[in-house]
Amino acid sequence: MAALPINGLNVCQKLEINVPVYAGMPQPIMRQQIVADNIHGETGLDGPVFEPLTRQAESTHAVKYIIDTLMASDGDITLVPVGPLSNIAVAMRMQPAILPKIREIVLMGGAYGTGNFTPSAEFNIFADPEAARVVFTSGVPLVMMGLDLTNQTVCTPDVIARMERAGGPAGELFSDIMNFTLKTQFENYGLAGGPVHDATCIGYLINPDGIKTQDMYVEVDVNSGPCYGRTVCDELGVLGKPANTKVGITIDTDWFWGLVEECVRGYIKTH
């Protein structure tokens, strides 16, 4: 997790995005830290070559920033975590008064089918299941973009070429990241393409109609064993418990890639 502020700073500097970057929890709240360097490389964002950093992270801890920002808000803030939920879970426990201040949480993580880090668990949830359990039991409205949805966004060499033609630093960054991803997908799984997981969350926020969801009761398994870190999704409602999550089911991939290209071209127009 320590590499994440550096990655965030690198991306912001390359794309000239003038927003503050905050460092958060260096470890999960209970378990030992795990990484997916076989997929994302040693830095967590291998592929692009970044210039030396000329900026640094803010001195305020990310958890404090989350709490302070939410407490000062009118309840109109949506959180979009695309990694382990450690920072949000700690913020919820430190200051429960933030819960009604959160409009919703649109997260990338979990699966109602097969995992990708274990047969049962998706990486982001498996990296800190106890934190995920705090979030999923918080009562805050949740939207889950899990593997069943995100794996439909298969990026191929043709998609990469399309974004390269769109041009600019954003197209270049997309190409560098996804060419590395395709390399590791082939090396690890023998696949010729790879999903673009995180962007589905932003796609949903821009146009929810592009993604079909189903209301489900979702519980995170924190028991030791082969299902540790699994998001148990009551797809058929057999438990009789109220739904706590909108779970992504299908995505209009033509719309999705069109939106990604629109964002790449939109970056060029604003810089």
UniProtKB/Swiss-Prot annotation:
Keywords: Glycosidase, Hydrolase
The keyword Hydrolase belongs to this UniProt entry's keyword annotation: yes
A Pfam family annotated for this UniProt entry: IU_nuc_hydro
Entry's Gene Ontology BP terms: purine nucleoside catabolic process
Gene3D superfamilies linked: Ribonucleoside hydrolase-like
Binding site for substrate: Q185, H197
PANTHER family according to UniProt: INOSINE-URIDINE PREFERRING NUCLEOSIDE HYDROLASE (PTHR12304), URIDINE NUCLEOSIDASE (PTHR12304:SF4)
Family the entry assigns: Belongs to the IUNH family. RihB subfamily.
Protein name: Putative pyrimidine-specific ribonucleoside hydrolase RihB
The organism of origin for this protein: Shigella dysenteriae serotype 1 (strain Sd197)
Lineage per the UniProt record: Bacteria, Pseudomonadati, Pseudomonadota, Gammaproteobacteria, Enterobacterales
The encoding gene: rihB
